[in-house]
């Protein structure tokens, strides 16, 4: 998790269990991560349900939510089904492409 927060513009990050919305690890501040984890669990579930309904048999690499002042990246873990990385970035200070790449690298290296 420390590696995620080192990303330029990163405010906070969490590892979330999408089966129950619980945070398994977190770092940083600026967002109520308990509330965000629960809400983003619903986002992940809704997208997966929609993909099944559409017959799409692919994986979600990441989900990007763009706000006026922030980026929120949700990255389901390919190697550990049911978990996702949640990263919040200050839009004015971050590089979205580099942050997405960092989330991908952390996902590959993260031991759960």
Predicted regions and their residues:
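Non-catalytic interaction/Regulatory regions outside core domains
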Residues: 1-13, 18-112
């Amino acid at each position: 998790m420390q590696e995620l927060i080192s990303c330029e513009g990163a405010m906070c990050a969490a590892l979330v269990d999408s089966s129950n919305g619980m945070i398994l690890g977190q770092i940083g501040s600026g967002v109520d991560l308990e509330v965000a984890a629960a809400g983003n669990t619903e986002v992940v579930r809704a997208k997966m349900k929609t993909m099944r309904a559409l017959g799409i048999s692919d994986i979600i690499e990441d989900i990007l939510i763009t706000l006026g002042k922030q980026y929120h990246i949700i990255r389901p873990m390919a190697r550990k089904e049911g978990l996702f990385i949640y990263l919040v970035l200050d839009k004015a200070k971050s590089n979205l492409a580099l942050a997405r790449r960092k989330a991908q690298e952390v996902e590959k290296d993260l031991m759960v």
